[in-house]
Amino acid sequence: MNKDAQMKAVINQKLIETGERERLKELLRAKLIECGWRDQLKAHCKDVINEKGVEHVTVDDLVAEITPKGRALVPDSVKKELLQRIRAFLAQHASL
């Protein structure tokens, strides 16, 4: 395992141990619902299914088509807030 992968694993473990990972996930979930991201993605899923026909779409097809749009639709403000929280966490746990 290279140094970056090792560091990532240590940080992830610390996020899990402290419960911060769950708090970040919950914050992200709430922010995405609040900004309408979830509704936009749900509508896009329905469009794809209607366009291709329910019999011709697998879950894997849907995930492959929706994922890039889903990532692109996340507002910059949400990304920045999450990044700020992660940086604050890392600053508090600088001994990692």
Swiss-Prot record:
Keyword Transport in annotation: yes
Sorted UniProt keywords: Activator, Chromatin regulator, mRNA transport, Nucleus, Protein transport, Transcription, Transcription regulation, Translocation, Transport
Single biological process term from Gene Ontology: chromatin organization
GO cellular component: DUBm complex; nuclear pore; nucleoplasm; SAGA complex; transcription export complex 2
Gene Ontology molecular function: chromatin binding; transcription coactivator activity
One Pfam family named in its UniProt record: EnY2
Domain of life from the UniProt record: Eukaryota
InterPro entries listed in its UniProt record: TF_ENY2, TF_EnY2_sf
Major site of localization recorded for this protein: nucleus
Subcellular location as annotated: Nucleus, Nucleoplasm
Quaternary structure and interacting proteins, as annotated: Component of the nuclear pore complex (NPC)-associated TREX-2 complex (transcription and export complex 2). Component of the SAGA transcription coactivator-HAT complex. Within the SAGA complex, participates in a subcomplex of SAGA called the DUB module (deubiquitination module).
Family membership noted in the UniProt record: Belongs to the ENY2 family.
Function: Involved in mRNA export coupled transcription activation by association with both the TREX-2 and the SAGA complexes. The transcription regulatory histone acetylation (HAT) complex SAGA is a multiprotein complex that activates transcription by remodeling chromatin and mediating histone acetylation and deubiquitination. Within the SAGA complex, participates in a subcomplex that specifically deubiquitinates histones. The SAGA complex is recruited to specific gene promoters by activators, where it is required for transcription.
Identification of the protein by name: Transcription and mRNA export factor ENY2
Lineage: Eukaryota, Metazoa, Chordata, Craniata, Vertebrata
